[in-house]
Amino acid sequence: MAIKPAYVKKTGTLLMDRYPKAFGDDFEHNKELVDELTNIESKSVRNRIAGYVTRKQRSPQQPA
């Protein structure tokens, strides 16, 4: 598993912070949301961000 670039993490985290209830653990749904909420034209970058968000949503929340 590769380490995600900083721009993917930053954009994904920003979207999850701004729209906490919008994203879920379904990649296809998250992909459509990333497409609607950003102006990213590259399909591969959109999919990377959606994949990062999906992975974060699926991971169990660990207490701080």
From Swiss-Prot:
One of its GO terms (cellular component) is ribonucleoprotein complex. Keywords: Ribonucleoprotein, Ribosomal protein. GO terms for biological process: translation. InterPro entries: Ribosomal_eS17, Ribosomal_eS17_CS, Ribosomal_eS17_sf. It holds the Pfam family Ribosomal_S17e. One of its GO terms (molecular function) is structural constituent of ribosome. It comes from the Archaea. NCBIfam families: PRK01151.1 (NF002242). Belongs to the eukaryotic ribosomal protein eS17 family. This is Small ribosomal subunit protein eS17. The lineage of its organism: Archaea, Methanobacteriati, Methanobacteriota, Stenosarchaea group, Halobacteria. The gene is rps17e.
